[in-house]
Design a protein with these regions (language model features):
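Non-catalytic alpha-helical scaffolds and adjoining flexible linkers that form interface surfaces
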Residues: 1-247
């Protein structure tokens, strides 16, 4: 019999299989995104019932199979049970899990994404930031981790770091006011929006959720991220549809 593999991760999604089993998707540090089957997890007295739910974060023991893994046990660090009582916060949380599942890859080092999920769920439960801003931060940082961050630190054309006020969605880059006159799809941005994007892209994870913006900047940041994310996410997110209805 194969030895169990210990992995650190978070359950991104769970769905019923058969009469008593569950299929779970776990984002792990060691193996990237994996699919595992929790046998008997839907039985009332199963030790796997509580550990095979979305948001659960900790150490999991799995056995590798031909096409998937089998979940055999877990040592949970955080269940995030209080998120279920936070509305609409919990729906934002489910959206972040779905986005992480979309970008996650099997065999990749997903440490950054896993850490981002953990601090983001804690940001939701603290309740100190506008959930719309938390969403913008998570989306842009996720894109950054995936290697598709926009160039926001110098003009794409001349390289200057001054007067960066024109964004090109087509080029995924910022331009100075002068060079921006020549691009096909100029999108005028306020300096505060550019600064917010820079901070989200480069800030240490521990300080990522340590800032706020005014309503005008937040509105612009939302519009920018909606358009930018549309370029990289081909799937229609079910949880995003719920968030849109709640607006």
């Amino acid at each position: 019999m194969r030895e169990p593999i210990n992995v650190s991760g978070m359950v991104l999604s769970a769905s019923p299989v058969g009469e008593y089993d569950k299929r779970v998707v776990i984002l792990t540090r060691e193996l990237g995104k994996i699919t595992a089957f929790a046998r008997g997890a839907r039985r009332m007295k199963s030790p796997l019932m509580a550990v095979s739910n979305p948001f659960v974060f900790g150490e999991f023991q799995v056995y590798e199979g031909r096409d998937s893994y089998t979940l055999s046990g877990a040592n949970i660090k955080e269940y995030f049970l209080d998120l279920a009582q936070m509305q609409p916060g919990v729906y934002y949380g489910f959206y972040f899990l779905e986005l992480a599942e979309y970008f996650g890859q099997e065999g990749n080092d997903e440490t950054q994404m896993l850490n981002l999920l953990y601090v983001t769920m804690n940001a939701i439960r603290r309740g100190k930031q506008d959930l719309r801003l938390i969403r913008c931060i998570f989306e842009l940082r996720t894109i950054t981790i995936s290697g598709e961050a926009p160039q926001m630190f110098s003009c794409m054309e001349c390289g200057t770091k001054e007067n960066l006020t024109v964004f090109s969605l087509r080029d995924s880059a910022i331009y100075c006011q002068n060079c921006g006159k020549t691009i096909r799809d100029p999108w005028a941005l306020q300096p505060g929006t550019v600064l917010a994007c820079r901070y989200i892209i480069a800030a240490p994870l521990a300080k990522l959720y340590g800032f706020t913006v005014n309503e005008e900047i937040l509105d612009e940041l939302e519009r920018l991220l909606r358009a930018y994310l549309h370029r990289y996410v081909e799937k229609k997110m079910k949880t995003l549809q719920i968030l849109d209805v709640m607006k």
